[in-house]
Amino acid sequence: MKTKLNFTGQAYDSSVIWIWLPLFLVLGLLVTGTQAIASSACAQTSKAALAACTSSATSDYWLGIGACDNLSDRQERQNCIDEARHSLNKEDLKTCNEQFQARQEVCRDLGGGPYDPDFSSENFVSNPADLTGNSYFPLTPGTYTYKSKDTAGNTLQTIVVRVKDDTTTIAGVLCRVVTDKVYEGAGTGGRLLEDTIDWYAQDSDGDVWYFGETTIAFTFDEAGNPTASTEGSWMAGMDEAKPGIIMFSVPEDQIGLLFRQEFALGTAEDLGRVIGTDASVTAGGVKYTGCVHTQDSTPLEPGVIEDKYYTPGVGLVLTVDPDGTREELIP
């Protein structure tokens, strides 16, 4: 083990630098990322999320260091520290930083104030018969089938969305129940990959709000055994989660503006931006005109932007992912 002298003339282990390196890194990210936006509520939220992310990313490292502290032999302790240091996942720390920077960009775009929308029940329709959505996001009962295709035209997934007659109450607000099932392959006979229940509400201006979801995603090992995850589930009013607007009744007034579609920090942070209201697209062999074009993103996946197109009287007809994958409504 190398031993050096500090400025007091006392000996210290150079390994100490490596032990505290993750903490120095976290502090460095906090200082660097907050220079542009002083101490606004939005910036403080970004810092809190960064701290949570880095804490998770360095948890195994610090537990390893704690175990090393209980080794009496210096060389064994040093070897233990080296092993713990090499177990540190730098990619996870990089992701934490990228998410932090993405949240800061959102703060610059939305302003530094807190996200605290008024979703009191008196601002929303309370009669199920009135819960019909708007022209670009209908909430009338019905079934929509989408096919997800790669750039070669191969069908990767089949998505079945059902707007149900059922309603429920979330945070005191009447919501329409919508189910969303994702199947592997070209039909509903493939493996179920995702099973989601969404909740949508409508305010007195006709804007459609997203009040949360409960979702189960399935992954499969080589033997075909499934593993289920509920990651991404959230509900407005629970654990400080808040709803957002999924579609404005007059999207023309929102062109170019960023807006939150949901907010459960670290779980659900989708945002939308209206790009235009007169797009023309072809999906499922049908040409649609006068479409609202939005771009959706989330700080949880920095740099990933989805282009979505909504046509009057129908709703969502096309989603285009960054890799060119197209999710098309099938008539």
Regions of interest found by a model, annotated:
Residues 12-14, 37, 256, 263:
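Compositionally biased, intrinsically disordered low-complexity segments enriched
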Residues 28-30, 45, 72, 307:
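Residues at the start of alpha-helices and the adjacent loop-to-helix junctions
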Residues 13, 28-31, 142, 200:
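N-terminal processing/targeting junctions
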Residues 19-32:
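Bacterial N-terminal signal peptides
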Residues 82, 94-331:
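Conserved functional acidic sites
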Residues 37-114:
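Soluble, non-transmembrane alpha-helical interaction regions
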Residues 1-17:
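N-terminal secretory signal peptides that target proteins for export/translocation
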